[in-house]
């Protein structure tokens, strides 16, 4: 139970502008406020009588998606490579992505392949998920300038 709570806190991390890792408290706040605005039936994400830009909302969801995918992929890789339990593997991976430095005792006994997975996740966590996503997406940006595709409304939920 305490490891799960620690994983949640490590994944969220600290506030922006500091040295803490994780997806940042403001990202979680924007995600929560966006869900709240959907439940209220309002179109805009609002906080303290201010409207959040749509770009911030998209970035927050992108950060969550990239970081969540990294955690899930890293956990699966550690499970396959190390033949360990789910909780210790998940704890190590979240600690690496959040650049926390805590361990459930698994790090010293990892194979070279497992250590490489953790190293890649640490670098990814240090650079932040959105920086990495923007780095890889920047080369596709020039092709979409000046054009808008038709809108398609789909049922969600």
Where are these predicted regions, by residue range?
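Membrane-proximal intracellular helices of multi-pass ion channels
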Residues: 1-157
């Amino acid at each position: 139970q305490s490891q799960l709570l620690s994983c949640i806190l490590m994944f969220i991390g600290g506030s922006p502008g500091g040295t803490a890792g994780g997806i940042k408290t403001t990202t979680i706040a924007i995600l929560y406020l966006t869900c709240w605005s959907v439940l209220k039936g309002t179109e805009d994400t609002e906080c303290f009588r201010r409207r959040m830009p749509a770009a911030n909302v998209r970035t927050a969801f992108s950060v969550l998606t990239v970081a969540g995918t990294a955690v899930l992929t890293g956990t699966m890789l550690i499970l396959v490579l190390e033949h360990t339990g789910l909780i210790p593997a998940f704890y190590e991976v979240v600690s690496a992505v959040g650049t926390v430095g805590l361990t459930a005792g698994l790090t010293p006994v990892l194979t070279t392949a497992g250590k490489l997975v953790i190293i890649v996740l640490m670098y990814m966590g240090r650079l932040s998920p959105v920086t990495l996503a923007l780095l890889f997406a920047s080369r596709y940006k020039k092709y979409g300038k000046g054009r808008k595709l038709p809108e398609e409304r789909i049922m969600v939920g």
